[in-house]
């Protein structure tokens, strides 16, 4: 029996016409709309029945499997929650409840959710008190995965292994954005029970907003070397994440990763959150930090940062400051047209080795710079010159270059990260990098005492510092930056993409002989890469040989996720070494290395590592063929 249609002139009939056939391109979009819609009408609805997309066979094949995380359901029936109606009479047949309902279905094109049917005529008046008591914003999103009350309660707190297991037990559906991240954290705790992890969920939604973590070994490293901290932030990573890494500088002048923070794009006050979480994880370092070098965003959070680190000088990374200044000049319309030499003048300003040199460069900027940009510079950067000019730098008297340390870490980071847009895969890569950095404690130092960690940075000492000074004075910072210059890694990303087509980072295991052949090929590539004494990969392998008890076996496979379970004896070494040929090609493409330089490095490194004659001849032959 068909239900009677309400008269078109009534309010309910008009609302039904407006709601029917309305489309939504994600379940989260529908949930936000429905929360506001219910609040306007004081209406209470709950999910009576539903069909999850994970049960549809056609949705499990790529690329349609992404629909599971976005649309979540193929069918949902929402009915009115008439709280005053008796649930079931003691005697007699059950009484009919409120007839109001809404049906949402997947569209025939399978790209959106559509309201196909609705009846908004209720059998009871609306009650504001009942609505205020029973209504829970975001309850539709909670039904998709986790209860909102649970995520709101645990958000912004450090979680223990038991908390992660409890969250996994609460999960109701296959929301891979949450499930995969929780599985990675569960594996991390299984491998390192002393790790520190803080989770932040979007308010009233079961959506991960921020993850902060550090392992027990990097926390010990931070407590050992807290004097100088560096912050490397990569906004818009893969177009889907913001990444912030806190580095410490060890006794040999190497930048070592201490903690990481992964967040949704545009998350406010990420630096303050990361520093506060870091100090909560290691409170004894608060009064021992003497210098913090971060990006230009630190200026907007300066009072909070100084409150967190009262004994530290706060600096702006000169390289990032220069890019920010030049981008602002382009925005104001002066760079390249009114003043084509602006980039060189900015480099001389930032690299001034004395107050006199700074005043001279500033006078030149006033004389030749665009008026709008000079006014902006005087208001925003000149009062803070102690934070970004070289002669006032904290590390200048210690023969260190914070900018070079940050650049070196960023290169290593971009080589390690796979081109995945998910939080879970990013966490896997970052945990692997922290383990690799921790393994560097056992790496023998090179002749210059710098070890393999500053492979691409100018040498320390007077000669290296003089080279950096000459580069600043001549404006040789790799050329004027263009839009998106921070992401000069197109070649690297292409190589990673090709590698992913065969490795299948999305979760598929290696299949039969094809997978084993790929492993053997990558292992051989790793053997050739091992002949580079100044490379990060070689340092990790040597360190891993000395620390087999910490870095091998099923413990490492646990947190790496199910897609790597087929690798029986690889451990962390296999993770770090796979694709090293691709990474080396990407690094040469990024930094301008030539094949001839790489071949000379291979020959020199073979003598340092005392490799076998067989390995040397094979490496030389392969490099000659490539060339």
From Swiss-Prot:
Disulfide bonds: none annotated. It holds the Pfam family DUF5575. Keywords: Isopeptide bond, Ubl conjugation. It comes from the Eukaryota. Residues 615-627 have a biased composition (Basic and acidic residues). Coiled coil: none annotated. Residues 441-466, 608-627 are annotated as: Disordered. PANTHER family: BTB DOMAIN-CONTAINING PROTEIN, ZINC FINGER SWIM-TYPE CONTAINING 9. This is Uncharacterized protein ZSWIM9. It comes from Homo sapiens (Human).
């Amino acid at each position: 029996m068909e239900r009677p249609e309400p008269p078109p002139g009534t309010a309910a009939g008009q609302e039904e016409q407006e709601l029917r056939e309305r489309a939504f391109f994600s379940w989260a979009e529908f949930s936000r709309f429905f929360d506001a819609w219910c609040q306007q009408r004081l209406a209470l609805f709950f999910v009576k029945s539903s069909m999850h997309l994970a049960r549809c066979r056609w949705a499990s094949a790529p690329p349609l499997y992404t629909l599971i995380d976005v649309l979540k359901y193929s069918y949902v029936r929402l009915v009115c929650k008439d709280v005053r109606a008796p649930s079931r009479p003691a005697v007699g047949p059950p009484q009919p409840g409120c007839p109001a309902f809404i049906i949402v279905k997947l569209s025939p094109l399978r790209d959106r959710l559509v309201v196909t049917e609705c009846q908004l005529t209720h059998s009871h008046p609306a009650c504001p008190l009942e609505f205020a008591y029973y209504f829970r914003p975001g309850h539709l999103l909670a039904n998709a995965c986790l209860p909102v009350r649970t995520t709101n309660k645990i958000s912004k707190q450090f979680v223990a292994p038991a908390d992660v297991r409890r969250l996994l037990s609460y999960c109701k559906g296959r929301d891979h954005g949450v499930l995969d991240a929780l599985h990675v954290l569960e594996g991390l705790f299984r491998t390192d029970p002393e790790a520190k992890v803080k989770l932040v969920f979007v308010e009233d939604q079961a959506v991960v907003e921020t993850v902060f973590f550090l392992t027990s070994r990097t926390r010990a490293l931070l407590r050992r070397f807290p004097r100088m901290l560096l912050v490397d932030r990569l906004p818009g990573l893969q177009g889907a994440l913001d990444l912030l890494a806190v580095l410490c500088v060890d006794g040999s002048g190497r930048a070592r990763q201490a903690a990481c923070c992964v967040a949704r794009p545009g998350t406010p006050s990420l630096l303050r959150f990361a520093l506060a979480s870091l100090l909560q994880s290691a409170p004894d370092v608060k009064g021992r930090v003497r210098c913090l070098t971060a990006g230009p965003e630190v200026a907007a959070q300066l009072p909070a940062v100084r409150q967190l680190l009262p004994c530290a000088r706060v600096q702006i990374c000169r390289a990032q400051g220069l890019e920010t200044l030049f981008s602002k000049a382009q925005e104001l319309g002066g760079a390249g047209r009114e003043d084509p030499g602006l980039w060189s003048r900015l480099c001389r300003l930032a690299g001034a080795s004395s107050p006199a040199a700074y005043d001279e460069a500033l006078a030149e900027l006033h004389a030749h710079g665009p008026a709008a940009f000079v006014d902006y510079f005087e208001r925003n950067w000149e009062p803070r010159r102690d934070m970004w000019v070289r002669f006032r730098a904290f590390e200048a008297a210690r023969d260190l270059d914070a900018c070079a340390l940050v650049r070196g870490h960023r290169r290593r980071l971009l080589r390690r990260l796979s081109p995945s847009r998910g939080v879970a895969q990013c966490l896997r890569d970052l945990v692997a990098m922290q383990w690799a950095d921790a393994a560097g404690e056992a790496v023998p130092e090179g002749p210059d005492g710098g070890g393999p960690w500053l492979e691409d940075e100018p040498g320390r000492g007077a000669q290296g510092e003089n080279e950096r000074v000459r580069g600043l004075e001549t404006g040789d910072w790799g050329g004027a930056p263009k839009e998106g210059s921070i992401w000069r890694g197109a070649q690297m990303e292409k190589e990673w993409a090709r590698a992913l087509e065969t490795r299948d980072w999305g979760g598929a295991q290696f299949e039969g002989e094809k997978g084993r052949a790929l492993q053997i090929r990558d292992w051989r590539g790793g053997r050739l890469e091992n002949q580079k004494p100044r490379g990060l990969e070689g340092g990790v392998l040597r360190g891993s040989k000395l620390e087999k008890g910490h870095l091998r076996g099923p413990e490492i496979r646990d947190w790496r996720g199910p897609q790597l379970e087929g690798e029986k004896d690889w451990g962390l070494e296999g993770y770090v070494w796979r694709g090293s040929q691709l990474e080396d090609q990407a690094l040469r493409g990024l930094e301008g290395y030539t094949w001839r330089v790489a071949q000379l490095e291979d020959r020199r490194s073979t003598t340092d590592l005392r490799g076998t004659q067989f390995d040397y001849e094979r490496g030389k032959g392969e490099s000659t063929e490539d060339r």
